[in-house]
Amino acid sequence: MHAIMLKAKLHRAEVTHAVLDYEGSCAIDGDWLDLSGIREYEQIQIYNVDNGERFTTYAIRAENGSKMISVNGAAAHKAKVGDRVIICAYAHYSEAELASHKPRMLYMAPGNQLSHTSEAIPIQVA
């Protein structure tokens, strides 16, 4: 049996560009791709915190250190500059892999400053 699990997440990144007349995709600062383990051309899910939109696209590399999150093509209708988004990648894991799986999560502060990284989400308390 395999399970689809969270592989990587960029939490509350700010959209820096929304380019309708681009080929599609989401350009992400190359440093963040490397740190999160998201691969170029990998399918990603984007959840817009500000307007509730949820959509699928693929990641492309933006210049390292640029702090860029560029939502391109038709997806540019679903996010505007300044929107806060959660970008997730998921993967299939075998039962054996699940025992040691830990997602890579990057948490962003305002201005797309990397706040911290984590491999676990704290338990939610009532």
Swiss-Prot record:
Cofactor detail note: Binds 1 pyruvoyl group covalently per subunit.
GO molecular function: aspartate 1-decarboxylase activity
Pathway connected to this protein: Cofactor biosynthesis; (R)-pantothenate biosynthesis; beta-alanine from L-aspartate: step 1/1
UniProt: substrate binding residues: T57, G73, A74, A75
Any Gene Ontology biological process: pantothenate biosynthetic process
EC number: 4.1.1.11
Subcellular location: Cytoplasm
Residues of the active site: S25 (schiff-base intermediate with substrate), Y58 (proton donor)
InterPro entries: Asp_de-COase-like_dom_sf, Asp_decarbox
Keywords noted in UniProt: Autocatalytic cleavage, Cytoplasm, Decarboxylase, Lyase, Pantothenate biosynthesis, Pyruvate, Schiff base, Zymogen
Post-translational modification: Is synthesized initially as an inactive proenzyme, which is activated by self-cleavage at a specific serine bond to produce a beta-subunit with a hydroxyl group at its C-terminus and an alpha-subunit with a pyruvoyl group at its N-terminus.
Residues carrying Pyruvic acid (Ser): S25
Single GO cellular component term: cytosol
Catalytic reaction annotation: L-aspartate + H(+) = beta-alanine + CO2
Cofactors required: pyruvate
Function: Catalyzes the pyruvoyl-dependent decarboxylation of aspartate to produce beta-alanine.
PANTHER family reported for this sequence: ASPARTATE 1-DECARBOXYLASE
HAMAP family with a match to the protein in the record: PanD
NCBIfam families found in the cross-reference section: panD
Record text on subunit structure and interactions: Heterooctamer of four alpha and four beta subunits.
Similarity field: Belongs to the PanD family.
Protein name, UniProt field: Aspartate 1-decarboxylase
Species annotation: Pseudomonas aeruginosa (strain LESB58)
